Amino acid sequence: MKEGYRLLGDFIQPVDERNRDLRVDYLLGVSISKQFIPSIANIVGTDLSNYKIVRTGQFAYGPVTSRNGEKISIALLRDKDCIISSSYTVFEVVNKNELDPEYLMLWFSRPEFDRYARYMSHGSVREIFEWDELCKVELPVPDIDKQRSIVKAYQTITERIELKRQINDNL
């Protein structure tokens, strides 16, 4: 392993909270653009009690990687709590003072992560990127202040690009 890199599995844990009491009715899915999106599923007559609850600050990913345009569906929930299909895997960062979830999401957004996930997927007809493989991902984990400064710099640049795009659209 490269110096300064750590295994992702040292920082994350799976979460399997079901919607047994049907208190959460905000149904979302996860897109290959790494965002939670409104579900297009027809849920008429569907028992939503087995759907998984995703809490704000948790992640979800679809382990099936085939037919996804070489990308993996993974996202960090920044909105209110939601439910997703039980086919997704939900997980969270165990200690947010060691690994910032926003920093981790930046790592997941890299094309290199998508390539790694596709390469490490197993299966013939239906390729799967399993939890164990996700835990084996090696990533640089600088101290938490450095992670937060990287996230802030990225967000600032992204906001400026969007502002310039809006200005250009008005010209």
Tell what function each PLM region has.
Residues 1-19, 140-170:
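Non-catalytic DNA-recognition/assembly elements of restriction-modification systems
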Residues 82-87, 122-151, 155:
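A short glycine-rich beta-alpha junction/loop motif
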Residues 4-61:
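Sequence-specific dsDNA recognition surfaces
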Residues 56, 60-111:
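A short beta-sheet element
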Residues 11, 100-135:
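Short, positively charged
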Residues 74-78, 105, 120, 152-154, ...:
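"Short basic amphipathic alpha-helical interaction patches in structured regions
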